[in-house]
């Protein structure tokens, strides 16, 4: 499963996921920050469980990742998902920097894109579905607030299927950062970078690919060539669930201004902004968020199946 030998006291893989990895079945990793910090209870737990079922219906195996009682878990029970949902912001949000300390302290932790990639790679999982990646925050030229997700994408061999970077971020600077570190930004059936709640943005992806098999082939070639690092697959939200650009941009601008006024910074900024945007849009952005996660899970399942077929 993985070249690195890690103690089972630190990393536990559920029987369903273990069986899939052993028998070379397609597996799709899922993060847990979206459960604890991305949505309110009970929609968060319900969505997480439904996303897992969606992946199973596509013929792949879901592997929701989190830290439970100081153990990195790959594949959660429904009870563990509901625990993260109920505890919400009381659960520690864990990125690369925080991971060893939360594990060492025996705490519960919700994994971001970065730490989910790390744990997925330890387990030997190559495909990961999420809502949106982190990126360069607005005003980063003054604050240097840049998500650790981007460096993880530069270094860790996992493909991340998302609806682009979260639209609360500076999308232009995020694309420039990814380019600098050689991270492919693939537009699935699009040349325009999706902007999370919206299908397009003023920015281009680095390449358009129109099928899961093309994406899987690129993964195989990239990693077999010794080109370490992840790939971003930007999958536009389905048209019927996309939000009007002027509506979402007005809500984001107001939320960003409020965050600055209240001094909300660092890893608390994204949960604050997403929650405030949901309030300002009367819950419409939350509905869109849920639907884009389902859409990404379906595409990730197809990519995982194609990758497994090619890589064996």
UniProtKB/Swiss-Prot annotation:
UniProt keyword list: Glycosidase, Hydrolase, Lyase, Manganese, Metal-binding
Binding site for Mn(2+): 145
Outcome of substituting residue 289 to A: 17-fold decrease in reaction rate while modest decrease in substrate affinity
InterPro entries: Indigdn_synthA-like, PsuG
Activity regulation comment: Inhibited by Zn(2+) and Ni(2+).
Annotated active site: 31, 166
An individual GO BP term: nucleobase catabolic process
Residue stretches spanning the membrane: none
Cofactor: Mn(2+); Fe(2+); Co(2+)
GO cellular component entries: cytoplasm; protein-containing complex
GO molecular function list: hydrolase activity, acting on glycosyl bonds; identical protein binding; manganese ion binding; pseudouridylate synthase activity
Catalytic activity: D-ribose 5-phosphate + uracil = psi-UMP + H2O
Co-factor binding details: Binds 1 manganese ion per subunit. Can also use Fe(2+) and Co(2+). The unusual metal binding site is heavily hydrated, coordinated with an aspartate side chain and five water molecules, and likely plays a role in anchoring the PsiMP phosphate.
UniProt-listed Enzyme Commission number(s): 4.2.1.70
Amino-acid positions noted as binding substrate in the UniProt annotation, renumbered to this chain: 93, 113, 147-149
Broad enzyme group: lyase
Biological function: Catalyzes the reversible cleavage of pseudouridine 5'-phosphate (PsiMP) to ribose 5-phosphate and uracil. Functions biologically in the cleavage direction, as part of a pseudouridine degradation pathway.
Protein family membership: Belongs to the pseudouridine-5'-phosphate glycosidase family.
Complex formation: Homotrimer.
Protein name: Pseudouridine-5'-phosphate glycosidase
Lineage: Bacteria, Pseudomonadati, Pseudomonadota, Gammaproteobacteria, Enterobacterales
Gene name for this UniProt entry: psuG
